[in-house]
Design a protein with these regions (language model features):
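ABC ATPase A-loop
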Residues: 99, 117, 135, 210, ...
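Glycine-rich hexapeptide-repeat left-handed beta-helix
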Residues: 58-60, 153-155, 160-261
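Terminal amphipathic alpha-helical/low-complexity segments used for targeting or macromolecular assembly
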Residues: 7, 11-14, 25-97, 232, ...
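Long amphipathic N-terminal alpha/beta scaffold segment
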Residues: 78-123
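Extended, compositionally simple hydrophobic/Ser/Thr-rich segments
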Residues: 116-117, 122-152, 156-161, 166-168, ...
Length: 261
């Protein structure tokens, strides 16, 4: 199914569903172009529907919120409190409020700012800059010249090459291709709005991207402030994404979204 916002000429809401169907009438035929989230479908972008909380040490913290961006303000305090409870047989406090699992692999020439937690079997590669307030799960890759700031990375997340991830939450097995980044501040410095129907005012100046489980972001893509990507969705390389992308979808160019088959 294809959605191209500039082409549809009509719409139909289907009762008992969470989608608005878009269609084009050509040669007396109705051609289904795709799906557009309605207010009822915003539940797809809740923490419950984006993430499997069994794959993060922040599970108890995240359960206290409905939408993921609501959790951003408290990440620093959460990490400090969580770090104090970690098993000292498993984690080393390398310096105040910097906890690293004994099985994590730290390469030379990295920076780990407090507070942060680096999980089991995670690699932090040369040139990585963890500015602080970063909870990195198990089996993750924080790659060369990658910068993290005020983030939660679920287990098995990979940000392996020249990525910037700020004020964001990345779900289980989310992967960002080389050079892809999250933009977390609007150019006019106003508060970030989640562009769905209806729009949601976050009341926050800095909001990056919320990536559901198993999301793939193509190389050199930019995720604009407040972008939300549903579970199991892909974003094409060099894309500029703004707003929300439904689960099980492929985001192409020019706001074209294709449902996975």
């Amino acid at each position: 199914m294809l959605l191209r916002m500039t082409e549809f000429v009509g719409c139909l809401f289907v009762p008992s569903t969470t989608f608005l169907l878009l269609f084009s009438v050509k040669s007396a035929k109705i051609i289904l172009l795709g799906i557009l989230p309605t207010e009822r479908s915003m539940k797809m972008y809740t923490i419950e529907n984006l993430y499997d909380l069994t794959h993060t040490m922040a599970a108890d913290y995240l359960k206290g919120f409905t939408y993921p961006w609501e959790a951003l303000k408290g990440i620093k305090d959460m990490i400090i409190a969580l770090g104090a409870t970690l098993n000292k047989d498993d984690f080393i406090e390398r310096e105040p409020q910097v906890w690293v699992h004994k099985t994590a692999k730290l390469f030379p020439n990295i920076y780990l700012g407090a507070p942060c937690i680096i999980g089991a079997n995670t690699e932090v590669r040369p040139g990585a800059f963890v500015r602080g307030s970063a909870l990195v799960g198990e089996n993750c890759v924080v790659g060369n010249s990658t910068e993290l700031k005020n983030v939660i990375l679920f287990d098995n997340v990979q940000v392996p090459h020249y990525n910037y991830v700020g004020d964001s939450i990345l779900g289980y097995k989310a992967h960002m291709g080389a050079g892809s980044i999250t933009s977390n501040v609007k150019s006019d410095k106003t508060l970030v709005v989640i562009h769905c129907d209806p729009e949601i005012a976050t009341g926050i100046k800095k909001v990056g991207a919320m990536l559901g489980d198993n999301v793939e972001i193509g190389c050199n893509s930019v995720l604009n402030p407040g972008t939300v990507i549903g579970r199991n969705s892909n974003v094409y390389p060099t894309s500029c994404v703004r707003g929300v992308v439904p689960e099980n979808s492929i985001y192409k160019k020019n706001d074209t979204i294709v449902a996975k088959r």
